[in-house]
Amino acid sequence: MSLTRLLIKDFRNIENADLALSPGFNFLVGANGSGKTSVLEAIYTLGHGRAFRSLQPGRVIRHEQEAFVLHGRLQGEERETSIGLTKDKQGDSKVRIDGTDGHKIAELAHLMPMQLITPEGFTLLNGGPKYRRAFLDWGCFHNEAGFFTAWSNLKRLLKQRNAALRQVSRYEQLRPWDKELIPLAEQISTWRAEYSSAIAQDMADTCQQFLPEFSLTFSFQRGWEKETDYADVLERSFERDRMLTYTAHGPHKADFRIRADGAPVEDTLSRGQLKLLMCALRLAQGEFLTRESGRRCLYLIDDFASELDDARRGLLASRLKATQSQVFVSAISAEHVIDMSDENSKMFTVEKGKITD
């Protein structure tokens, strides 16, 4: 699907905007602080229910307003879908799909698979394991129908188990939680392992094109010892968990390690190379989704020119065009993106929250 129309009301510094969009490349050009990143963030929020620069709703609602409103029209091969999201300062959300309320944010995420590339996105590579778990979980969410429910239930059970660890004195008192937790943990870990294995060749091929000077390897670590039943791990670590008052092993501790020439990528690659690797991973993930399901991602790229020279920008642009996906790119100057433009592209100018084409 592609986003054919976007309406923004009271989001960041944007009072009102009504944008007719290209199914190909859409460029947002403006000075720092003009609001171009806010447009990308509005699209992201419409598909995720939250902004990527702040988790606090009050910070993305325009000054002295009570709520933001986002609305979009998605065009698929056979039908058009209308989607909307309203969120107030208390964080209460209302999701509307095709004119009906009561929908879940997960439904928006399913309708709008998207890949986000920002200057802060290096956390995928040099941040904590939670960022790499999120990378795998994006793929599992879009490839396994039961993943979201299973992961939601797992988080609920872990929260309850951690609370119980403060109260119990014997492991037997935890068995009611672990009886539900264990099969969920094993299923989620299986899905993650299968996904990381299935996408490995796509990642290797794309990374080879972007970073041919390195040999990159990928490994999934499930969050507890190999060849060990999760039930045994939970029982054996009970005393330590009780002392820590949290569950020290499980899918919530998994990681997806990426190494270049045998060393962690964050210790080996320059910032420009890290950005190329991040782009390669996002592209590989989007292309894998298209091949497996026929669905295409939306790509959101903030500050396209940062960290990349002309040759690397050209390589990224050509790969994005080859996906035949909808792409949104922000840049300070039109000179940085003009060579990516074609007859189907749209160029928007952003100034103090006002957007013109």
UniProtKB/Swiss-Prot annotation:
It comes from the Bacteria. Disulfide bonds: none annotated. One of its GO terms (cellular component) is cytoplasm. ATP binds at residues 30-37. Keywords: ATP-binding, Cytoplasm, DNA damage, DNA repair, DNA replication, DNA-binding, Nucleotide-binding, SOS response. The keyword Nucleotide-binding applies. GO terms for biological process: DNA replication; DNA synthesis involved in DNA repair; double-strand break repair; SOS response. One of its GO terms (molecular function) is ATP binding. Pfam families: SMC_N. It is found in: Cytoplasm. Signal peptide: none annotated. The keyword tRNA processing does not apply. The RecF protein is involved in DNA metabolism; it is required for DNA replication and normal SOS inducibility. RecF binds preferentially to single-stranded, linear DNA. It also seems to bind ATP. PANTHER family: DNA REPLICATION AND REPAIR PROTEIN RECF. Belongs to the RecF family. This is DNA replication and repair protein RecF.
